[in-house]
């Protein structure tokens, strides 16, 4: 109450921001007449002028007025579109670390040209981020003429591009891409073996379209690059047969309650838990199958993996539904994005869940994968120096944007007032009654030729409603994950008179629904249309447009409330764009997911009793409050989940940044010999200290153990015991120094034989490969630690603090192991003299000639062979692992390069 009074007196923060920006709009508008007088060449020359001024010390903010005036005038000439004042305000908001909330139809795509041009002047690259490939291509092609007129290069970066094309895309001034492709390219860059293989430049400025979808809805989705793990297909198939024998119970066992079921479900978190009774039953079945020994339990360390498979199968059967969470297409399980309703081809659930669902659906089970590299969107986008976003609905999540990303949200006023009629929700007792009322509502709209967009929460619900409409004889289009390819065509027709379109949870978002239908889409179907054909299409559209306007514009029907008010607002926002008329209404039932999960049985029973007859609709302010309360609970729950994930991921993120920084240093540096020397001293000191403790007496020394480890781990044959017998006063420090110096001398003699260049390449290759391998194993270990860390809470310990402590210990151990492995490999390699190499090459040449009649080498293989033969010296396979990097610097494993079969001489 007090905050409302203060706001009424002083205005809100948003009001003050807008007031300040409107003053700057006045300055930009004053420049308009001056810029209109410029010739095309003079206008285009502004870009070079701005870049020169930046080089001389000017700031982007000092150029803003002129830069925006330049873009506005160029847009008017090239695209026939002039930026509104509110779009200039939006552009200023997006220039820095802010989020602009702009209603649907207010021209976000055109607004984006302003901050993109301004930030591209820095020459560091601008990334415009969209939710799918279609929007990335569409927006790039829409704005390309404008940017190219102003001398800026534009490119699109999507999945499947050739490496060179992708590299060129990132070198463009403005790159349009999807959030997932940007994240995956970042991970790929940090798996590259040479700096030339990398794609991305410095992460400078990102402008995220539909920012709420990417930074909020998908925040908990980690981007993962995986490699194959061991095959467990038969185990998934076997365990899949167990689940039908298990019985559900309503709540978990406790001191006061013991159920008769085998498992309980946590619908909020999509988790399943076996009861004690269920555990015994599953153990019995697994023993009968021969997967466990008699008397073993699933909590035995050797059987934990089986328990993991059981839980994955239980979740697959009881918590994940076909046509809701995934579809089966061409013999594959394809995930449905819960936030957009679109399919996510190529994405797979982790932790064995995807394989469990494949077993459930009796399709081919693809192998499990081991994480090689991963990052969340939260941490990826926080890597940018400047981050901004735009969406139609951000204000409800303003607190989270500020807390997690440090981004302020500014609500941009509409160019024209919104006159959409948002009607009160209607509540029905059952889903069947609700669907009947929806059909009646659609028929009423069609009677006056009003187009209707019906929003559903899942593919399953959209198909149920579609079947009901078909039975009622109502012609309609369905836009869901199964009809993704026809999305643009369906959306183009959604605003036509009497059109009925069913859309899953905002599928089609990002494309405006034009009242009367999209005449440009009709025009695009014609090859070289004549003026007469163009006029005929426009005239027909105008007639349809007038009809729809008189009918009340686009009517939105929501078939149930979503977990977030923001998603509901997005659905409503499809109607009433740019001052057009429109209306919306949500139809609810007590069977809806939101009601079942977040309202207790007592409230539901009370509400059921309020209905006196079948088909009766309830609408009241109390109902609205109950729904708002349920949504607030969900939003709070989801925010805590995302915040919790970030707190854990921040621990891994610090380690990730350290590893990737080290990796980039290795790629950029040609000579790491100084680093290797430092590591060698550390490793040998550590090893020697294990067997000869510092400041200890000789009786405590384990000389035999030291000789053995130096031989096996470092290939050094040292008569340390003999030294001690001959030199009675040989001090510990002197002995330590002698061993380290001998190790250096051995290494230097190898380098003299093989040459400094080859040795530098080998050092770098060994370091990179070992770093990648150990980091991959570390990620798996961190995953396991994360999954079980919550159990520390039962021991009255803070799981987050325990996770930080243990993960740091694991990270430190990994780095120590890295140093040890690298020095071990470098110490054990053996080299041969030039004479031995020439003899080996002569034998090899003779062998190659003998085989030439049966083998035709490709040009590439011949060139590679020629390059290998030209090396000044050869490393043998005597003391080097076949999986170690080849010293020639090719980036290949030894067994695939100089260690290949032809090279074993």
UniProtKB/Swiss-Prot annotation:
Residues 565-584 are annotated as: Disordered. It is an enzyme of class 7 (translocase). It is found in: Cell inner membrane; Cytoplasm. GO terms for biological process: intracellular protein transmembrane transport; protein import; protein targeting; protein transport by the Sec complex. Its EC number is 7.4.2.8. The keyword Signal does not apply. It catalyses: ATP + H2O + cellular proteinSide 1 = ADP + phosphate + cellular proteinSide 2. GO terms for cellular component: cell envelope Sec protein transport complex; cytosol; plasma membrane. Disulfide bonds: none annotated. Belongs to the SecA family. Monomer and homodimer. Part of the essential Sec protein translocation apparatus which comprises SecA, SecYEG and auxiliary proteins SecDF-YajC and YidC. This is Protein translocase subunit SecA. It comes from Haemophilus ducreyi (strain 35000HP / ATCC 700724).
